[in-house]
């Protein structure tokens, strides 16, 4: 946890990117695990918009599993990474991204920003976030 958040006793934020939590089994399992943690060490943010250019770059370069997780979630990742940071794709509703083939509706994407963790699997949430002391 960052020094500033520690002083303020604020939990870190974990984002779950999903186009439709109701129809995505992996996203449902991820959310269930995250919400089931009673330690209050983190807040859960449900993101239904495509990551911003900055977020995408952070996940890709700062998180060890970033490139693999992003490739599973964003089928056209190589093309998207070439877009200008002002491209309307960044911040676009994920449902539109699914329709355009830019977002895999069967995957989940979660990000623990502070600990530089990113993944697609619910089991990794348990392994890297819930069990982490």
Swiss-Prot record:
Q: Which Pfam families match?
A: DUF1687
UniProt keyword Amino-acid biosynthesis present:
no
Record-level Gene Ontology MF annotations: oxidoreductase activity
Gene3D superfamilies in alphabetical order: Glutaredoxin
The record places the transit peptide at 1-21
Could you say which EC number(s) this protein's record lists? 1.-.-.-
- A single GO BP: negative regulation of transport
Q: Where is the protein situated, by its record's location annotation?
A: Mitochondrion
Q: Which UniProt keywords apply?
A: Mitochondrion, Oxidoreductase, Transit peptide
Q: Please report any disulfide bonds recorded for this protein chain, giving both cysteine positions.
A: none
Which family does the record claim for this protein?
Answer: Belongs to the FMP46 family.
Role summary: Putative mitochondrial redox protein which could be involved in the reduction of small toxic molecules.
Put simply, this protein is called Putative redox protein FMP46, mitochondrial
| Biological classification of the source | Eukaryota, Fungi, Dikarya, Ascomycota, Saccharomycotina
């Amino acid at each position: 946890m960052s020094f500033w958040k520690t002083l303020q006793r604020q939990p870190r934020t974990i984002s779950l990117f999903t186009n439709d939590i109701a129809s995505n089994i992996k996203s449902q399992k991820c959310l269930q695990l995250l919400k089931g943690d009673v330690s209050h060490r983190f807040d859960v943010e449900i993101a239904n918009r495509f990551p911003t250019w900055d977020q995408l770059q952070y996940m890709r370069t700062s998180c060890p599993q970033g490139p693999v997780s992003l490739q599973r979630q964003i089928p056209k990742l190589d093309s998207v990474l070439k877009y200008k940071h002002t491209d309307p794709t960044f911040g676009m509703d994920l449902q539109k991204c699914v329709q355009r083939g830019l977002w895999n509706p069967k995957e989940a994407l979660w990000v623990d920003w502070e600990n530089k963790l990113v993944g697609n699997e619910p089991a990794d949430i348990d392994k890297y976030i819930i069990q982490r002391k």
